Amino acid sequence: MQNVIGIRTLRRSVNEALLRVARGETIVLVRHGHPVAILRPLAEGETHRRVSVTTFRRNLRRAVLVSHRRPIMLTWYGDGAAVLAPVPPDLELEYEEDDLR
C-alpha cells in the first residue's frame, strides 16, 4: 500500500504531510483518483525553484500544475522541506478509496 493523499486532504493537513515527508516518506497526490504529483524528501544538494509552504498552501492548485513541468522545492523558514515533483510515468497506484479522505 502506498502513501496516497487527495488534494483536498492535503489542503487541510499540509503540515502533517510535510512531517511524514521529513521522516522519509514519499506521498502520491491524487485528484479524482488520478495521480497529479508526488511529494518527496529533498535529496542532498538538490536545488529547484523555491516556494514557501505558506505560499504553496495558498496556491495549491497552481503549484501542482507547475510541478507537472518541473519540480518545486517547498521551504519552511527558508530551509528546504520537501519537493513537489511530476508523477513518474511508470507509477502504478495501489490504494483504497478510504485513503483519499
Identify the role of each PLM range.
Residues 95-101:
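Juxtadomain coupling helices with adjacent low-complexity linkers
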Residues 17, 24-26, 32, 68-77:
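Major-groove DNA-recognition helix of helix-turn-helix-type DNA-binding domains
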Residues 7-22, 51-68:
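The conserved cystathionine-beta-synthase
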Residues 1-6:
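Short Lys/Arg-rich basic patches
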Residues 47-54, 100:
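Disulfide-bonded cysteine-rich modules in secreted/extracellular proteins
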Residues 7, 31, 53, 75-76:
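Nucleic acid-binding interface residues in structured DNA/RNA-binding domains
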Residues 70, 86, 101:
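Short coil/turn motifs at helix boundaries and re-entrant loops, enriched in small/polar
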Residues 28, 35-45, 73, 80-95:
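Short beta->alpha transition motifs characteristic of CBS
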